[in-house]
Amino acid sequence: MSDIEFVPNKNNLANLDELSLLSSVLSEKRICELYELAEFSSGLIEEMLSDGFGIYEALSLISQELSDRVPQIHENHLPENLEMLTSYSKAFSAFDKASFSKLLLKGLRLRGISLSEKDFFEKEVRKESIAYVKNQLASEAYDVFSEAFSEPRLRYANDLREAVNLVLTGEVGYAILPLEEKGGARLSSITEILFNSELKINSVTPVFGALGNADMKYALVSPTVSVPTREIGDDRYLELRIAGENTHKFSELVSAAESLGTELYRVNTLNFSTEDGTLPYFSLVLKTEAGDFTEMLIYLTLFVSDYTSVGIYKNLE
């Protein structure tokens, strides 16, 4: 067996190299077409914004024409190649959508429209008050989170449900909840609380306890997404939840995230009880180092209609 050697056919390799070059030429042509489409779209968005429309309304108008496009496959293909050709076409479709999102943001900024992450979320000034269930680990998390406030106020809750209700009723601005147990696994009970109450993660910090061996993570949560400042060397996270019925949309989203310079940090499958029964969901956490998620948020708004932002946050390690 040791004498067996694999020697690929040089003609096959040369032909594949030539086809790669041709594919590169075609890809650049796609980029040029996408550039013109993005230029036209950015002009339309500029006009809509000047007429008082919001960014969501403007992007939704464009989305109606772009999101349902079906990848085309030539008619003379061999039947046995259809499945692989479909995969290639889907990959090109994901590339097109990510590239269009990038080019659209570039076109808007060239027109003086400084679109950023904050434009995609509700603006709300919240009380500088924080509720949590008193214990050593939660108090350690409070010491970290409270540094972001000028005059933080503390309110103890009897249990996690009360802490959540205090936020939902507006009696306090934020709550502190345990998020991950030792080893990094998400606490399923907290994940369900976030889903049912529609709370957002504003910040995350590790806590270690008096002996230094607890190694859990706690989250600062509120009803609205809070966009943290960007600083050199900061890792920032965008957490999303999408319905698990469409696996193609999930795989396309992951491809787009990579194209737009973000890293897939974590993915979980979840099941939640709703009025329509138990439904599956994907939970994705995307990571960027000192970057932002504006291009990704444009992509999501245009092409992923059923996503939910769970938060943009830093891990305050």
Predicted feature descriptions by range:
Residues 2-317:
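Domain-level signature for soluble enzymes in the chorismate/prephenate branch of the shikimate pathway
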